A protein has these predicted regions:
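Long, structured stretches of catalytic cores involved in phosphate-ester chemistry, encompassing
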Residues: 1-121
């Protein structure tokens, strides 16, 4: 799905998400190349409505040669935490509901652009 050269976090259903990160070495695409979707919010394309939580988004008035906005994503899994009996000890305990965090960063500046946290059901 990331072939359209933009990054996004989309909630498809309560248990299904789609994440893409790109482009890394090529131009982004205009929103008009992607069905004129919004940058975020509800979007229906075909039979399914989805919730675009965040995306890179570029209007068609930007020359294609200027669409050079790389984005990368770091995925962090929080499934255990340290719960030592003594201050200098280590004891890993499982979270009852693990968490995954998708963190999108600007590929040129390294600044955080968006983060989405999901807890297991």
């Amino acid at each position: 799905t990331g072939d359209l050269h933009n990054s996004f976090a989309i909630k498809i259903t309560d248990k299904v998400w789609e994440f893409a990160s790109g482009p890394h070495n090529s131009n982004n695409h205009w929103a008009s190349d992607e069905g004129d979707r919004p940058p975020n919010g509800p979007f229906k394309y075909g039979p399914r409505e989805v919730d675009i939580r965040w995306s890179t988004y570029f209007r068609s008035d930007i020359p294609r040669g200027k669409l050079l906005h790389p984005t990368y994503c770091v995925v962090q899994i929080n499934n255990v935490f340290n719960n030592p009996r003594n201050l200098t000890d280590t004891r890993w305990v499982a979270f009852p509901k693990p968490q995954v965090i998708f963190q999108y960063y600007d590929g040129r500046t390294g600044r955080l652009r968006y983060a989405e946290s999901i807890l297991s059901p």
